[in-house]
Amino acid sequence: MTHDLQQKSKLSAVEKIKAKSRYLRGTIQEGLADLATGAVVEEDTKLLKFHGTYQQDDRDLRTERMRQKLEPAYSFMVRVRMPGGVCMPKQWLQLDELARKYANNSLRITTRQTFQFHSVVKRHLRSTIAGINEALLSTIAACGDVNRNVVCHNNPYLSPLHKTVYEWSKRLSNHFLPQTQAYHEIWMGKEKVAGTLPENEEPIYGETYLPRKFKIGITIPPNNEIDVFSQDLGLIAIAKGSRLVGFNICVGGGMGMTHSEPSTYPRLGDVIGFCTPSQLLEVAENILKIQRDFGNRCDRKQARLKYTIDSRSIDWFKAELNQRLGWDLEPARPFHFESNGDHFGWVEDSKGRWHLTLFLLSGRIKDTLDQPLMTGLREIAKIHKGDFRLTTNQNLTIANISKTNKPRIEALLEKYRIPMPERFSPIRQHAMSCVALPSCGLAMAESERMLPGFLARLEAVVEKAGLADEPITLRVTGCPNGCSRPYISEIALVGKSLGRYNLYLGAGFAGQRLNKLYRESLTEDEIIATLSPLFEHYARERQQGEHFGDFVVRAGYVDEVRAGREFHEVRSEKAVQSA
């Protein structure tokens, strides 16, 4: 592989850990058995990600535990691999039980169309992951330097085309699944065959896997709910009528960056061509292998595919791909996107089956005094004969409901006070957040916990400006890594320090343009005060059909970002103001 040419002395610490891990085994077994601590050793925390779990600690308790001379309150986040976001009712009930037995009595829908469990302590980690597998699901490759959960349009019942695209998400997921037996040995108690390990347990990945995570998503125009341009490999389904004819190939998207390091930036993917369905696996595998072979293994901040492309060129990438394929991609086919949000409420398909998409703020499923959401969805799962579909916007579709079962589900929604989505404002429906504090070790500020209160204040300002019915995308993240895909949101708050956020404006409503830093290190009060006159200006002078993100660019509040490397550029006469 080309990365072998990189000087081994300069390889990142994680690369060295992977190389000696014996295909992700490390000393995880020994660490799980050591109950004298709630943690595992540092090297194994890197390997556990490939198994679908992150070691964390409760940051709300850090200071007090330090004062008491106790180790941090360690726990683990466990993420499910669920291509296309499909969950059957029986699986829902099994995951619900695991969350109540081993986690923090909640489930969280992620921005990659799957579930996360939080606050799983080490002594329950094996039981939790084994339980997920007993539900015929898995956690392998939900995290780590591999292909992550493959996302696609959330409802395959809407048309034959949607069903075909969903099937492709499963095929891609299975094709790039790690082959190591370490997962089954550690979590399901499979005995390792005596003797040495196979010479190569990973025919696609190799012993050091990828330089960084790799994300694949499929979308069907005109909806871009998966934010296809944010994917390492984005696939835009091209159809004639309801028949899939192929995919436009989009490469090099990614959200993460680091504050004050302009060499790191979000990037939207480039559309480089078109392939037929029969060519897709070959194309996808070779794109992943180019990243495997040429991705930066010395600096993890430069290790995503977006930097591999920008450090050489998109023309180099296309030439390398065509050379490996032995043939050229066809020219990309025309397409058009209208939005990157979900379509809420009841929808009836051509076969008379019903589908209901619910709005779930931040994807959090838990019981509160005002709304026993987790209990209500559990009761629905007990009678539901269809399935559940998770969306990449952290919402939930109860899918494939028969005409006779629809009234029963409606009755349960009312009984457990689960509101219909039309009760929520458009800006709330288009809002997302990451988890952030107290569990995420990278968070610099609140996100999920601050969003409800902030949204209420923002809704009042929007309503005062006469924009209560205007859809505007809002995303909040506790750090610049961008798990809620903030840099393709019309308004984005990115945590800078506790209680302070960088304010970004100007992304495209359909996720087709990056936003730009407008103000730095603002408090919530300052953000509200900053946005209020912009909303009033927008209400007065917007053009017919003009979205807020387009307006702030046209009005000159921020410059249009045409490429990721322009993201940090600031015109001298529009220098970013610090609070």
UniProtKB/Swiss-Prot annotation:
InterPro entries: CysI, NiRdtase/SiRdtase_haem-b_fer, Nit/Sulf_reduc_fer-like_dom_sf, NO2/SO3_Rdtase_4Fe4S_dom, NO2/SO3_Rdtase_4Fe4S_prot, NO2/SO3_Rdtase_4Fe4S_sf, NO2/SO3_Rdtase_FeS/sirohaem_BS. One of its GO terms (biological process) is cysteine biosynthetic process. Its EC number is 1.8.1.2. Belongs to the nitrite and sulfite reductase 4Fe-4S domain family. It catalyses: hydrogen sulfide + 3 NADP(+) + 3 H2O = sulfite + 3 NADPH + 4 H(+). Keywords: 4Fe-4S, Amino-acid biosynthesis, Cysteine biosynthesis, Heme, Iron, Iron-sulfur, Metal-binding, NADP, Oxidoreductase. Alpha(8)-beta(8). The alpha component is a flavoprotein, the beta component is a hemoprotein. The lineage of its organism: Bacteria, Pseudomonadati, Pseudomonadota, Gammaproteobacteria, Chromatiales. The gene is cysI. Binds 1 siroheme per subunit. Binds 1 [4Fe-4S] cluster per subunit. GO terms for molecular function: 4 iron, 4 sulfur cluster binding; heme binding; metal ion binding; NADP binding; sulfite reductase (ferredoxin) activity; sulfite reductase (NADPH) activity. This is Sulfite reductase [NADPH] hemoprotein beta-component. SUPFAM superfamilies: Nitrite and sulphite reductase 4Fe-4S domain-like, Nitrite/Sulfite reductase N-terminal domain-like. [4Fe-4S] cluster binds at residues 434, 440, 479, 483. Pfam families: NIR_SIR, NIR_SIR_ferr. Signal peptide: none annotated. It comes from Nitrosococcus oceani (strain ATCC 19707 / BCRC 17464 / JCM 30415 / NCIMB 11848 / C-107).
